[in-house]
Amino acid sequence: NRKTCGDTHLDSYTFIGSPIISGYKERGSALKERMREAFLDFFEKRGHARLKPYPVIARWRDDIHLTIASIADFQPHVTSGRTPPPANPLTISQPCIRLTDVAAVGRSGRHLTTFEMMAHHAFNRDSTGEYHYWIDNCVRLCDELLVETFGIDPTEITYVENPWSGGGNAGAALEVIVGGLELATLVFMDLEEHEEGEIEIKGLKYRQMDQKIIDTGYGLERFCWAAAGTPTIYETVYPESVRFLRKMAKFDDRIDSLDIPLDIDTLLGVLSPGVLRMRVEFGRRWVYIAC
């Protein structure tokens, strides 16, 4: 009976002040740790090997500097089929840094530049007959996680079709919307970029590939926000920093003052693995210097 997909300018956040995930009273790192463990444990109990996260500096790739998604851990070597996956199927919670939304940080109340992408991946291959699960079972696992583990009302979950592409691959995808917030994206990756491809997605040509890959992304911080119900995601993820900065700088509750803790967290995330981030052209371009 919905008139919108749940993620439009007409849809408000229904979880603000009324969390859609109950039973989580923690905030900050304690909440993230508990939420992360609940996710990983769910998939580990369902036959997925738990992997340690990869570095946020994508040293194994020559097309990107930063790890921007969990699937980036496996592109291009595993997704192309040249290298076997480290486990199959697998689950991981991958720290990411993504600067494309930097202008929206602090304005929307939900955008982040550093975040963790919880995920479960499966690598199916037609030529070898290796098959784990595909679309139906992927959606079933997602639904079970949301309803049985996190107690979300199933009537509040909306699955929105929206093709995905990135890193030379593409596929059909479902965005998972609850309470006006996109919690996850389920990608059914079976296409590879090719100049003679017959399938066009977002201006690029693709062709079918031998592998059929389950590529999912669940926003850890967004799950935490949905469990906390704070006015913005920043009070959930950085509660101590927000309180300290408001007190010391005499900030009021305006959202645009809340991006400072996130900037600090992103900077520390980049410096820790050995990369210095330097802005060379304000608002337009970033340069990364490996140390």
Regions found by a protein language model. Give the residues of each.
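Cysteine-rich micro-motifs
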Residues: 2-10
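Structured aminoacyl-transfer and RNA-binding surfaces used for tRNA recognition/handling
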Residues: 15-291
